[in-house]
């Protein structure tokens, strides 16, 4: 009924009428309801994201440059062909690469990654008037090449173009944006990545110009994936109805939809999940990517799914102490290699906060939550 009441996924289009997934996903975060963003269901109109933006902007551009993402999130994004790049991890933390996806984390690109989009954040020669623009320049680590549009809109990686400063970011150790040898050690990307998503592209910390953006609490894409998830648990045989709403999200994202034949973007569809378990995992992965870095959606999902193992153990990033553009695992100075950034502990009792002892003392009928 949402569509009948004027709500819709926010989309922008190329000159030929095709969906521009880069501009659609990016401006979904910045456009207000009265500017055509009918995806917003609930929002806080009076909200400040100054600190969020300030901590996401690179140190060399006068930001604090410490708000980033983990390697595990980078791994979760699909390839441009709609297939997952990483399907899991070995006991030693090594990624299990999906060879069918074309993913490669060895070497660097020799050609720019050019797509049909008006998005101008990918390289210095990008223009809104262009039919096509570079979204990843030549020389980009292959881990970041041929990924889906949501990846480039969401993650700022070493060597990416940063338009506000007209330069490529430098996350190498003691680099312009990297970890310093002394001083404010945390004002640098601890995992080798910073956030790009929800940081308005016109943000300029140098003159403290941070454009307004709505505080979106709930949007239509979440309603779609909530419905798909619930239906898969209740009536998994209704595959067509489930995929309808998953595919609506993937359509806007510019990646192949599930099914057979051509999808609405003219792309070859990829095989649909084979059973309820596979569908559950597909929906969960779509949620992780689509809602990355939006409030507590991911954490709340993990809690309600009771996936305790995701919340504990080793979390990876790139080698923030690396000084060389190298992906050689045997080179201690190589930046582009996986490194354990932090090891976290999480037990079952951490699914909930305890009730304060003062409250228990006031009401003998209250019972403490499990394991506290």
Name the predicted role of every residue range.
Residues 234-242:
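Structural helix-adjacent loops and short alpha-helical linkers that scaffold large soluble proteins
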């Amino acid at each position: 009924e949402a569509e009948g009441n004027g709500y819709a996924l926010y989309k922008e289009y190329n000159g030929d009428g095709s969906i521009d997934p880069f501009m659609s996903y990016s401006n979904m975060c910045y456009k207000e309801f009265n500017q055509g963003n009918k995806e917003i269901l609930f929002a806080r109109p009076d909200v400040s994201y100054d600190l969020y933006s300030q901590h996401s902007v690179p140190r060399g551009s006068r930001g604090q440059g410490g708000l980033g993402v983990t390697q595990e999130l980078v791994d979760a994004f699909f390839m441009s062909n709609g297939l997952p790049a990483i399907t899991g991890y070995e006991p030693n933390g090594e990624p299990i690469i999906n060879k069918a996806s074309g993913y490669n984390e060895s070497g660097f690109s020799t050609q720019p990654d050019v797509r049909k989009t008006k998005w101008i954040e990918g390289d210095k020669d990008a223009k809104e008037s262009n039919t096509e623009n570079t979204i990843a320049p030549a020389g980009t680590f292959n881990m970041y090449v041929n990924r889906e549009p949501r990846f480039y809109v969401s993650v700022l990686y070493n060597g990416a173009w940063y338009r506000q400063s007209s330069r490529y970011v430098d996350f190498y150790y003691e680099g312009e944006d990297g970890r310093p040898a002394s001083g404010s050690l945390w004002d640098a990307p601890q995992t080798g990545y910073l956030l790009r998503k929800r940081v308005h592209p016109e943000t300029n910390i140098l003159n403290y110009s941070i454009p307004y953006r709505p505080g979106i609490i709930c949007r239509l894409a979440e309603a779609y994936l909530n419905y798909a998830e619930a239906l898969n648990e209740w009536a998994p045989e209704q595959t067509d109805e489930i995929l309808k709403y998953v595919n609506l999200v993937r359509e806007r994202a510019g990646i192949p939809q599930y099914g057979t034949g051509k999808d609405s973007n003219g792309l070859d569809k990829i095989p649909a999940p084979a059973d309820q378990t596979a569908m559950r995992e597909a929906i969960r992965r779509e949620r992780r990517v689509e809602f990355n870095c939006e409030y507590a959606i991911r954490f709340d999902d993990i809690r309600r799914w009771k996936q305790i193992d995701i919340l504990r153990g080793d979390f990876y990033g790139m080698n923030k102490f690396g000084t060389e553009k190298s992906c050689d695992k045997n080179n201690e100075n190589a930046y582009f290699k996986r490194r354990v950034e932090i090891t976290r502990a999480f037990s079952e009792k951490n699914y909930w906060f305890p009730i304060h002892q003062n409250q228990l003392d006031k009401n003998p009928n209250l019972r403490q939550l499990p394991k506290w």
